[in-house]
């Protein structure tokens, strides 16, 4: 079946103007996630911020109670004992100058990047490569840290980084279609709570304006914010 026809069929039974309770919304998208692969369930939150202003930036990290269903590759910039700690914790790639050269050469063999503070002058050279991908280590979200073992285990255990995009939207994967409805709802609420707590000082008016959930190949379903927050 062509993608267009599949999506049209999936939209049947969904009121595109209605705000659904989160449990009902999750059921609707799970029922329509019929691809041969285990589709990712995603959330999109429209925020009342303008990220062009520094005091309206929203960024953070949250460990989802039921994980993401995805195995992240973790890269760590560290030397000596900290490099050994990272390896023991399960980091996929660990290095210093050698890892910088690898990344500069166009090979990024990781999805999450962690660094010890002393490595940041070196890692800073990769700003143009890692920055646009949202992978630059940042102390505010715990990816610049001396506790590299804890950061690696957190990344491997289901932590999700979130960051508001230019249009004022936060998007993130919160699990797989194979997850139970209850686990997906718990993950949605955990992420939404973290975004709510990350409300910047410069935000004015309604902070979380709209919420929608979808699967990788399915239609979006609008969610009643009150069933997610609080």
UniProtKB/Swiss-Prot annotation:
GO BP terms: regulation of translation; translation
InterPro entries, A to Z: Ribosom_uL1_bac-type, Ribosomal_uL1, Ribosomal_uL1-like, Ribosomal_uL1/biogenesis, Ribosomal_uL1_3-a/b-sand, Ribosomal_uL1_CS
PROSITE patterns given in the database record: RIBOSOMAL_L1
Pfam family, one: Ribosomal_L1
GO molecular function, a single term: tRNA binding
Record flagged with keyword RNA-binding: yes
GO cellular component terms listed in the entry, alphabetical order: cytosolic large ribosomal subunit
Lineage top rank: taxon: Bacteria
SUPFAM superfamilies xref list: Ribosomal protein L1
Coiled coil ranges: none
Keywords: Repressor, Ribonucleoprotein, Ribosomal protein, RNA-binding, rRNA-binding, Translation regulation, tRNA-binding
Described purpose of this protein according to its UniProt entry: Binds directly to 23S rRNA. The L1 stalk is quite mobile in the ribosome, and is involved in E site tRNA release.
Subunit description: Part of the 50S ribosomal subunit.
Family: Belongs to the universal ribosomal protein uL1 family.
Name of the protein: Large ribosomal subunit protein uL1
Species of provenance: Nitrobacter hamburgensis (strain DSM 10229 / NCIMB 13809 / X14)
């Amino acid at each position: 079946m062509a993608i267009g026809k599949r999506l049209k069929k999936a939209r049947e039974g969904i009121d595109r103007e209605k705000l659904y309770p989160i449990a009902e919304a999750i059921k609707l998208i799970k029922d329509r996630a019929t691809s041969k692969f285990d589709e990712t369930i995603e959330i999109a939150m429209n925020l009342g911020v303008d990220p062009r202003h520094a005091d309206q930036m929203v960024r953070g990290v949250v460990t989802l109670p039921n994980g993401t269903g995805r195995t992240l590759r973790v890269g760590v910039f560290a030397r000596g004992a900290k490099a050994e700690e990272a390896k023991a914790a399960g980091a996929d790639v660990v290095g210093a100058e050698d890892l910088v050269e690898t990344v500069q050469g166009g090979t990024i063999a990781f999805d999450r990047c962690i660094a010890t503070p002393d490595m940041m002058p070196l890692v800073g050279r990769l700003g143009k490569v890692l920055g646009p991908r949202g992978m630059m280590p940042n102390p505010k979200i715990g990816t610049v840290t001396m506790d590299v073992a804890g950061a690696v285990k957190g990344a491997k255990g289901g932590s999700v980084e979130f960051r508001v995009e230019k249009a004022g939207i936060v998007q993130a994967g919160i699990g797989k279609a194979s997850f139970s409805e209850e686990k997906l709802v718990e993950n949605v609420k955990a992420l939404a709570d973290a975004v709510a707590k990350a409300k910047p000082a410069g935000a004015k008016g309604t902070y979380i304006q709209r919420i929608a959930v979808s699967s990788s190949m399915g239609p979006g379903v609008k969610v009643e914010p009150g069933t997610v927050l609080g």
